[in-house]
Amino acid sequence: MADEQNLDNQNPETPEQSQADVAEDLAARVQSLEEQLAAAQDQSLRVAAELQNIRRRAEQDVEKAHKFALEKFAGDLLAVADSLERGLELSNPDDEAVKPMREGVELTLKLLLDTLARHQLEQLDPHGEPFNPEHHQAMAMEESTHVEPGSVLKVFQKGYLLNGRLLRPAMVVVSKAPADAPPSIDEKA
């Protein structure tokens, strides 16, 4: 009993002080839990936003994969179209012996180009257009008085777009202004 009295004398707290301490502890605990809740809610929002971004990126990747899946295959077919066009260029349209073969090649080329167009492959034939470095590759420059400088004079190889994206640039010859001709002998005199 004496020990209990000594303990009571050592802790001379009143019940009001004890309740105040408990209230402070509870208030601190509530504040700590509110901070943890806010942090958890913030983390939950960030995770939800990240999931939405991942889902959106995955959808875009799938869309691009579908859109450009034909890129390699279409690129390989362009050599076939080029060969058919060269064959037509080199054959004489007036030669009766090759006329049926020429018509067959023309129909085959038309069928191939129509098929490519159905799959959003667009042919670029820039003859006479202004040079566009985004769609054309200049192979040479040639002086010309017939067209404006910077225009496409000749097309060595047609270019192609797949779904609006450049698959192959057109290989072209670009015009340039003629150099001033040296004065003739008559002009010197």
Curated annotation (Swiss-Prot):
N-terminal signal peptide: none
CDD domains with a match to the protein in the record: GrpE
Keyword field contains Nucleotidyltransferase: no
Protein's cellular compartments: Cytoplasm
Record-linked Gene3D superfamilies: 3.90.20.20, Head domain of nucleotide exchange factor GrpE
Molecular functions (GO terms): adenyl-nucleotide exchange factor activity; protein homodimerization activity; protein-folding chaperone binding; unfolded protein binding
This protein's record includes keyword Chaperone: yes
UniProtKB keywords: Chaperone, Cytoplasm, Stress response
Purpose of the protein: Participates actively in the response to hyperosmotic and heat shock by preventing the aggregation of stress-denatured proteins, in association with DnaK and GrpE. It is the nucleotide exchange factor for DnaK and may function as a thermosensor. Unfolded proteins bind initially to DnaJ; upon interaction with the DnaJ-bound protein, DnaK hydrolyzes its bound ATP, resulting in the formation of a stable complex. GrpE releases ADP from DnaK; ATP binding to DnaK triggers the release of the substrate protein, thus completing the reaction cycle.
Protein name: Protein GrpE
Gene this protein is translated from: grpE
